[in-house]
Amino acid sequence: MSEFEYPQGYGLIAGVDEVGRGPLVGAVVTAAVILDPNNPISGLADSKKLSEKKRLVLAAEIKEKALAWSLGRAEAEEIDELNILHATMLAMRRAVKSLKILPHLVLVDGNRVPELDMPAQAIIKGDGKVAEISAASILAKVARDQEMETLDKQFPQYEFAKHKGYPTKVHLEKLMRFGALPQHRRSFAPVRKAIEEFNRTQ
């Protein structure tokens, strides 16, 4: 974790991150975390750079040691209705509002912040710089991956556990072969094209 200079004059700081903007299926999942400065967690990093095993271990530790944590989400229908950017902002707002303690400042990964009731700051590549954002990225990633495992059990023919809903060659082939599920994001071009191809071959 690189040295990050926290803005001065704030008490409780929450980190917020999202997982699942790119996949073709399921919700975009966000997390908000307020860490306890007196109970540090070692090994926090961008969730994408950690093994699944390490993420699971850290997620349990974050939930145990954080002053507060919560998840937010926007479903595929909301993504289709609002677009992925606005749905992500909505999911971030939901995560922050669900915190049992309200933070004085929110640090958000990326270059945009949602409308919140407290000051917020966007930090580009924040999941590799800010411990709170790293913790949020880990919780969101673990939660979304578990949702894909569940979906995989319900619809094994799509192999969601392997590709986690991302637009891989395998996923696109399955979409064209079996059609789209209610959980698929119909506003995403690859899903639309796959539905057209599926309908054409029926």
UniProtKB/Swiss-Prot annotation:
Q: Which GO terms describe its cellular component?
A: cytoplasm; ribonuclease H2 complex
Keywords of this protein's UniProt record, alphabetized? Cytoplasm, Endonuclease, Hydrolase, Manganese, Metal-binding, Nuclease
**Which reaction equations make up its catalytic activity?**
Endonucleolytic cleavage to 5'-phosphomonoester
Q: Where in the cell is it found?
A: Cytoplasm
- According to the entry, every stretch annotated as the RNase H type-2 domain falls at 11-200
What does the record's cofactor remark say about binding?
Answer: Manganese or magnesium. Binds 1 divalent metal ion per monomer in the absence of substrate. May bind a second metal ion after substrate binding.
InterPro entries in UniProt: RNase_HII, RNase_HII/HIII, RNase_HII/HIII_dom, RNaseH-like_sf, RNaseH_sf
Q: Which GO terms describe its molecular function?
A: manganese ion binding; RNA binding; RNA-DNA hybrid ribonuclease activity
What are the required cofactors? Mn(2+); Mg(2+)
Predominant cellular place of this UniProt entry's protein: cytoplasm
Annotated a divalent metal cation binding sites: 17-18, 109
Q: Which EC numbers does the record give?
A: 3.1.26.4
Provide the GO biological process annotations. Answer: DNA replication, removal of RNA primer; mismatch repair
Which residues are connected by disulfide bridges in this protein?
A: none
Spell out the family assignment given in the record's similarity comment: Belongs to the RNase HII family.
What this protein is reported to do is described as:
Endonuclease that specifically degrades the RNA of RNA-DNA hybrids.
This chain belongs to the protein called Ribonuclease HII
Please give the organism: Actinobacillus succinogenes (strain ATCC 55618 / DSM 22257 / CCUG 43843 / 130Z)
Source organism phylogeny? Bacteria, Pseudomonadati, Pseudomonadota, Gammaproteobacteria, Pasteurellales
Q: What's the encoding gene here?
A: rnhB
